[in-house]
Amino acid sequence: MKRTYQPKKRHRSRVHGFRKRMSTSNGRQVLARRRQKGRKVLSA
């Protein structure tokens, strides 16, 4: 049985990346929350 996580840089950035987050209002809310919390990394 293969492992479920098969990392791909393109898929990671397209699904969870900064530009993807910025493209929707909810994504911008996510970034705002993470900035407020003081996260070092905002997105993938």
UniProtKB/Swiss-Prot annotation:
PROSITE patterns: RIBOSOMAL_L34. Residues 1-22, 31-44 have a biased composition (Basic residues). InterPro entries: Ribosomal_bL34, Ribosomal_bL34_CS. Keywords: Ribonucleoprotein, Ribosomal protein. It holds the Pfam family Ribosomal_L34. GO terms for biological process: translation. The gene is rpmH. GO terms for molecular function: structural constituent of ribosome. This is Large ribosomal subunit protein bL34. It comes from Levilactobacillus brevis (strain ATCC 367 / BCRC 12310 / CIP 105137 / JCM 1170 / LMG 11437 / NCIMB 947 / NCTC 947). Coiled coil: none annotated. Signal peptide: none annotated. Residues 1-44 are annotated as: Disordered. One of its GO terms (cellular component) is ribonucleoprotein complex. Belongs to the bacterial ribosomal protein bL34 family.
